Amino acid sequence: GLWQVREWEWREHGVDLTLARLSPLSAGQGSADPGRPNRPPDLTLAPTQLVACEVPWDGNPGTPVPMILALASSANGGWPGASLYVDQGDGALLPLGPSGRTRAVIGTASTVLQSASPLLYDRQSSVTIALAGEDLTLDDATMRQLAMGANRAVLGSEIVQFASAEPLGEGEWRLSGFLRGRGGTETAVTGHQAGEALALLGSAGTILNAEAVGAVPSSRIVAIGLGDSLPVSATIALRGIGMRPPSPVHPRWQVDLDGSYRLTWVRRARGGWLWQDGVDLP
């Protein structure tokens, strides 16, 4: 067997040793696979991409009005987030806080979304979107889910909902099956162009302090991350939509007995976007 020398001492007759016997090795013991470390992926610091917009009031008394969102993202998951600022037109950057590490689902339109009626389900139109990162995804939605507000996105100056998201590879998706002009954006169903920004509402957007942003129409939201050589800025899309009442509907005219014309319409209230059963829209 094997022994280990614990102590030793010189004596007249020689050297005294204190030994400890080692446990014998098992007969079948041999070398083993040391395994592989679970190292995190070594991702580069990709630059920040940013979309900023104001969204319509959702009818919840606890929701700030106006509600301005900064949706920041990047090409990969190694992005550590960014610091957000507002430039009110004088070049000074006023801090708004961090964006957080979770990437928002944003992208740009590679094709043009054609105009369509906001009163009907748009089965004909489609648009191709290049997302900020190839690992970002979009989901399909049923008609019931659309009626409850699923897949709302800002595309240019229009809020749309889409039922179908078809992956095309390399971060591109084809969106189709639209509800158009949502949230009082009916006037923006025309005038779309390639290169305009898309931002999926309900993803990792940061709610900004509206008082800190200010009311200057030319204000821009600025993001600065570790991978950015220069600040990234974006104008605030849909500015004022949270405070502006939607356009009226159901215009009618009639001739009274005295020959005069009577014009009538139905006003819409902010916040009444869901199609609730048994309740007329306000």
Question: Each PLM stretch: what is its role?
Answer:
Residues G1-P282:
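C-terminal extracytoplasmic interaction modules
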